């Protein structure tokens, strides 16, 4: 059935919040290989929904709020911080895989080598799921309790999930020794087993189409705080939200790198573009593969604080 024509359109964005004061947590997510539906198996010892072998890997998804699609002036949202555009075009995986786009899920190419030189292993990648017309209504969470989860998509128009460490996106042949196609599958956690920010299925089918009207916003440097479960980035600025026209809803990916440092941080805004389904490579056959997912682990301990904004946040928003 899908969403009605009047339903706000969905957009996807990925934010890389590059902060060097604390290490990210081991958390939930799916960054790995997509299998044919008939051959999906849970990795031994892994969480529900893990496809094939698994290993700890921080990754998260998120979203924004609903509204009506309206052009947004970039100048209106820019702040006096340095920006660097990095050429990058997110897209549906080119591998010839069954079920790579379904009514509630789709599979993205892994942006390998995209963040080289822009982020370190202590940084975190967030995937933000939002209605594409939510740019004006979305507010960055300021406390842990404010971070939206997937059930809030249809009420608040956004949620956050799937934190990922940049070292999960190395250069080199992603197929080496794996025998499968490396992808990022969105909406795979049907049972929402991977709390607190599960990678829940999307509320309806695509299609996912390109649109040249993409509105870019800046993401400010984030603040970190530690609780007994995870380290959570707390946004102090506005993440990017991209507008896209389509028949039902849209999928967009917008990576943003925010470098943290003493006093201030330079933000790097990467190009975002509507997801599209490119021609399948003829040299590649139909594949199955073991998937790599993040899995909750013991919380990392804070490193020595080099950034004043990181101090005094340990007790704010703790989970009991």
From Swiss-Prot:
GO terms for biological process: negative regulation of gene expression. Residues 267-320 are cytoplasmic. One of its GO terms (cellular component) is plasma membrane. Keywords: Cell membrane, Glycoprotein, Membrane, Signal, Transmembrane, Transmembrane helix. Glycans are attached at residue 133. Residues 1-29 form the signal peptide. It comes from the Eukaryota. The chain crosses the membrane at residues 241-266. Residues 30-240 are lumenal. It is found in: Cell membrane. It is a single-pass type I membrane protein. Coiled coil: none annotated. The keyword Signal applies. Residues 273-303 are annotated as: Disordered. InterPro entries: Uroplakin-3. Heterodimer with uroplakin-1B (UPK1B). Component of the asymmetric unit membrane (AUM); a highly specialized biomembrane elaborated by terminally differentiated urothelial cells. May play an important role in AUM-cytoskeleton interaction in terminally differentiated urothelial cells. It also contributes to the formation of urothelial glycocalyx which may play an important role in preventing bacterial adherence. Belongs to the uroplakin-3 family. This is Uroplakin-3b. The gene is UPK3B.
